[in-house]
Amino acid sequence: MKKTMTFHRKKIWMVFLVCALMLLGLVGRLVYLMGVRSDYYYQKAEELHERERAIKAARGQIMDAKGRVLADNKTVCTISVIHSQIKKPQKVIEILSKELGMDTDTVRKKVEKISSIERIKTNVEKSVGDVIRGYELDGVKVDEDYKRYYPYGSLASKVLGFTGGDNQGIIGLEVKYEEILKGQAGKILTTTDARGVEIDQLGESREDPVAGENLKISLDVDLQQYAQQAALKVMEEKQAARVSILLMNPQNGEIYVCVNVPEFDLNDPFTLNADVDTSGLNEQEKQDLLNQMWRNPCLNDTYEPGSTFKIITMSAGLEAGVVSVNDRFFCPGYKLVDDRRIHCARRTGHGSQSFVEGAQNSCNPVFIEVGLRLGVENYYHYFKKFGLLKKTGVDLPGEAGTIMHKMENMGNVELATVAFGQSFQITPIQLATTVSSLLNGGRRITPHFGVSILSSDGTSGRKLEYPVETGIISEKTSETVRGILEKVVSEGSGRNARIEGCTVGGKTATSQTLPRSANRYISSFLGFMPAEDPQILGICIIHDPQGVYYGGTIAAPVIKNIFEAVLERV
């Protein structure tokens, strides 16, 4: 009996001890939660009763060289609902469906969805948002937002680019300068009770957004409009596939004009141009067409430059001393290179001519001879030294690189064709940049649009700087090249670019596209003025013109007209 009582007493003590330990553990846990972790759980409790809504920042403007706004903001609204606060769901559904022009079932699903906040529609016109706000519907929020707006429509569309639904840059300058333009979003914090209803007495906590900075660019609206009209005119007259025009300062790299027609409407960038047939196309095929429409051929696409590239061969030959302006050549209408007969554009030949006359006549055999005198290794040396194997660094996304033979794969035939601008490909911006360095005394500048960054209120700003590489060629060679190219315009194949009272230099080009048997051409002209001290360099490239296709006949007059427009504005 005594043993049994002792056994029960032990069991009681064990139960008591276990309970005491459990109680002690609970007390310890409570102390830990209320003391050590109190801040953490206070924050969690706050989060349960706080609702956050983002306030988008006003995106920075993009302005042209004279301060005219090219990309601006338009006030729009975002319509949202808070399920727990809606008192009359059917009324909310009916009004939102009506005012937003949305399907009733779509709105119903969003309104009846149990979530802290549900977005109904974004980018709603402010006038519509004001009407909805006027209904004073419980649980319906109307927040003002921003949508990108482009006052000039399609002007410089492939340069400026556009933003998506979230107002972030997608292509062009909009994406290149995203970090500068986007600003910093703000937020609104509201406190709710356990049912999720906002507590009016506590109001709301607001953190204001910070507007993005403004970007000033070198592009000139007047010149861009003039050049775009000139490009459209020649595209229509020659029934060409597309036309590109580039105008820049060869001394500092500022780009004044960058036209690529057909352009597209920046305010409706996801709609293909009217002349594009989309019947029978699936969504991926339509997207591919959009991607093609958005491309900027001046820097995203490469082409065979043809005879405009003779400027590079000329400069390399003069710098290396393998040719002089007084050297004489004979052109029978072709040049034999190894076992290949390479023809001149003039099949009957130019006969005896000086190097300068060879440039005026755009004679292929003359430049083949200069290339052969240089040799593969030396020609490749200058090709690389002039910067043709690297990208220009232009401040737009997606710049394509040069497509060139590897030096070890180049023979005399490849060298001969490269010397007059065929069998390899570069971008128009690369050609313009390289020729600029050969005309300005040997400084390889960086082509660019961005000039300065300005604060949103215009009270402060900073100038953008770009790298410059010196010693590309000597000043003496540069001066000689300028003189030869002035003769090309005043007395040679570029005579259609002559301007009374102003010295113009330049080079024509007419190159066949692949396959050669298709008889399709790229006609172009590169010009600069004044010839003795170039301040403007321009290129016009016409793809697949019909009828007369010579660059000196159809592209040179376009640059002439644009140069005259520049002179009128000086």
Task: Show where each model-derived region lies.
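Periplasmic/cell-envelope proteins involved in peptidoglycan metabolism and beta-lactam response
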Residues: M1-T278, T302, E377-L389, A497-E500, ...
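Beta-lactam-recognizing serine transpeptidase/beta-lactamase-like catalytic domain environment
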Residues: A71, D193-E204, Q251-T308, I312-D544, ...
